Every structure is written in C-alpha cells, then in structure tokens.
Amino acid sequence: MQFDVEKIKFLRNKTQAGIMDCQKALINSKGDIDQAIIFLRKQGIKKASEITGKILGEGLTNVIIDNNEAVLYELNSETDFVAKNKIFLDLLNLLGKILLKETKPNMNIDEILNLKFEDKKIKDLLLEKTAIVQEKICLRKVIKVIKKDDENFGMYKHQNGFISVLVITKNSKKDVSEDIAMHIAANKPKFINKEQVDLETLNQEKSIIEAQVNKELGNEKTFNIKEKIIEGRLNKFIQNICLIEQSFVKNPEQKLRDYLKEKEVEIINYWRLEVGERI
C-alpha cells in the first residue's frame, strides 16, 4: 500500500517520527491519520520503555517564578547533544508550566511523575520524548516553593541552566536578591549560617583535619599547638560552607553578612541545582 508524500510529511511533522515509521503507521491504520498517530504513540512508548538505563549525567536545570510560587527542577539526558535539542528544550519549558501549576511543596518524584497534564501522565510524556530522541530523558529533581507576601524571590541561571538557584529574602530589592542567587551559584554553600551546621558534618571534617595535621607535623609540635591549628582549619571550613560567612562574589573584600547588613536584607532560605550533581 502506497501513500502520498504529503500525508507522510504531515505525519512526520505531527509526531516527529521517522519516514519508515510513518509509512508503517499509515499501513497499519489504512491511511487514517488519527489512528496512525495513536499507533506511533503506542510504538514509541514501547520502544522508550526498552531503552536501557544509562547514567543520565547531562541535561539542564530551570527555575520559574510566578508571584508567590516558584519551581526549581532538573531534566536529564544521556548526552549533551540531546540536551541542546529543540525537543528537549521545548519539553523543559513545558514541564516548567506543568510543575508550577500542578505540584505542591514536598511532593516526591513518584507523585510528580504520576501527575496528569491533558489526560497524560508526566512519566508518559517523558517516555514519548525518549522514543523520539532515542535517548532516555528523566525528570530527576523537583522543588516547589511558596513564599510569604512580605518575602522576595531571587533567581539566577548559570550557563543557560547548568546551574539554577532560587533564594527567598526579606526586605530585598530584585537586584540584591539576584546578586545573592548569583553568589550561591558560584560559591556552593551548604548552610546559611554557622548555627545550621550539624554536629555530624563538624565531627567528620574535624577527624579529617586531625589526620592531616598529625601526618604533616608528627611529633614536631605540642598538643596545644596542634589543637590551635585544627581549630583554625575547622573555622576556615565553616566559613567556606556557610553562606553569610563567605566572601561576597561581587566584592571579595567584603563578607556576605556585611553586604546583607548594609542592604538590611535577611536570607530566609535558598535552593541550588547543578546538572548531574550527586549522580
């Protein structure tokens, strides 16, 4: 059975499937375009589910803000080539709209993947795009945030989404919140201040520093001198991981806490996503 080129072309544009797949779908549906589209979708999902699970270390992050709500998320692919593909980028933007509207704070990824958009679950949408690009696409992280009326959002994206940051501040103008978000992207803090640093983190780092100092100095220095060196290095470690103790990225001579004091701004919370982090 032969079909005219225009019908195949229309089906390709509609589904982004290959020529041979479009021909097969038209044969199966006896030329019915709607049935051919259904056939291709079913075949695509079947193929996508068979694609083996490689480590998805590429992709993009994104952050979207709408009034008091924001969503931060990471969409992964196997290769950088697919992450730059229009199909992937369109999916990234579509997911942002869906996630901003449909998700709630503290939803787990399984709950999110089972959310429906136009009678289609998010996980099925991902499978469809996986079938088209012939490479697994995965929604790995989603963070939904709701702020209070008297708080401010700030956001920053580095390298078109390799890193995305969202920050909540109080008494802050837009440019100040964005500067703080940019600083977080660059300096990768783990806590806002010293008080948030947990005992497990401190003890783990202290044991590492103690081992380093003992190896470096051996029996050359007294216990008290070693303790002072260990204390100094531990304080330096705390400064490096605590946001407000870090040197401000736009003015390294100034601590971020001094910049915040100068601007009379308080940091409430922040979130930072980097592609492939902790995979």
Curated annotation (Swiss-Prot):
Q: Give the Gene Ontology MF terms in alphabetical order.
A: translation elongation factor activity
Instruction: Kindly list the GO CC terms recorded for this protein.
Output: cytoplasm
Subcellular localization(s) per the UniProt record? Cytoplasm
Q: What is the predominant subcellular site recorded for this chain? A: cytoplasm
What keywords is this UniProt entry annotated with? Cytoplasm, Elongation factor, Protein biosynthesis
Q: Which domain of life is it from?
A: Bacteria
Q: Which PANTHER family match?
A: ELONGATION FACTOR TS, ELONGATION FACTOR TS, MITOCHONDRIAL
Q: What does this protein do?
A: Associates with the EF-Tu.GDP complex and induces the exchange of GDP to GTP. It remains bound to the aminoacyl-tRNA.EF-Tu.GTP complex up to the GTP hydrolysis stage on the ribosome.
The entry sums up its family as follows: Belongs to the EF-Ts family.
> Per its UniProt record, what NCBIfam families does this chain match?
tsf
Record HAMAP family:
EF_Ts (MF_00050)
- Identify this protein by name: Elongation factor Ts
Q: Which organism is it from?
A: Phytoplasma mali (strain AT)
Where is the organism placed in the taxonomic lineage, from the top?
A: Bacteria, Bacillati, Mycoplasmatota, Mollicutes, Acholeplasmatales
Gene name of the encoded protein: tsf
